Amino acid sequence: MTSYEMAKEKYAAWGVDTEKAMEQLKKVPVSLHCWQLDDVMGFDNDGALTGGIQTTGNYPGRAKTPEQLMADMEEAMKLMPGTAKLNIHASYAIFEEGEFADRDALEPKHFAKWVAFAKKHHMGIDFNPTFFSHEKVKNGLTLSSPDEETRKFWIEHGKACIRISEYFARETGMPCVMNIWTGDGFKDVPADRMGPRLRYKDSIEQILSEPYDKNLVKPCVESKVFGIGVESYTVGSAEFTLSFAAMHDGCMPLMDNGHYHPQEYVSDKIPAMLCFYPEFALHITRGVRWDSDHVLLLDDETKEMAKEIVRNQALDRVYMALDYFDASINRVSALATGFRSWQKALLMALCTPNEQLKELQDTNQLGRLMVMQEAVKMLPIGEVWEEYCRREGVTDDAHFYDAIEKYEKEVLVNRN
């Protein structure tokens, strides 16, 4: 009997079918963010990263061209079990020699190479308008700017992205989640908190007035508590985005678990959201004291978020995407590690006897519940994970970095 077969029997004694869990997991799409591989630089300008976000580190091997980025993503995907979607920002438009279009004039043709990449790997594509790192971010504002010319530019950018999102969905045959997030806000105490939000509301409404198939494009709005240089006031607050999505049919809220106060837990917010929203989106990251976007690991909050999605039968209601960027380590490793961590969290949740534990809570057997929750932590999930990786044709954790190291020595170090 193999170690997996013994683990399978132990789980069966708890009423858990590990075969069913693995079968479910491999079908769950998780969106894979391209910006980990190039430190959120993009291809449409050479300026510095702005928008209240920051990458730290200078590890060699950053992708500097579309070809390099796609090669790195392919290398990372070789190490990932399960189903991945591609997640790109508008700033990753790919232009032919001598060609350029500003963000308000982007067209589907500028993303044709991404579609070819996605089709090659049987992936869907999610999309993000890029409301940062651009000369037309005026005084830190885009969609909420009091300057109508500035605001109009960014509204047109959003509309262009709606059209591009529908192109992605039609080409790949999978819905495209289009996330609207801006870093709009103020460093110090504002004199008017409502005005920028009214302009922001109007701008998003204008973007969503662009005709699109609601079965193909899934717009969402993302909140944030603060960013670098916008510590005192963020236009797109949690209350704003939740209210906007609730009042606009077809628009979802998006929660990034790094975009809240450190003592707020998105795992607690997930079941609350499921009470009211048919669907919503999630950006999964790891914040250390703030929205630092560290590489996702199998930490407590990661596991708790996965639990809430799984035990509330919401795998088909929550659009899951990774969002972090670390320039201090091998970027291919960072991308693959985070993806594998979320797969582990989902697998653990799928291998939890959720109904048994719920029954103990509902019958007020809270002492027994605590003991059983602790006992579940000691079940042999590692053996199930290794079997899942084996079936998916990817390496186990013990040998995971060997492939990364080989790629670094053969490819990445030569880029500098």
Where are these regions (language model features)?
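Acidic/histidine-rich catalytic cores of soluble enzymes
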Residues: 189-301
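Aromatic- and glycine-enriched pocket-lining scaffold segments that form the walls
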Residues: 169, 175-189
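Catalytic beta/alpha-barrel core
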Residues: 150-153, 257
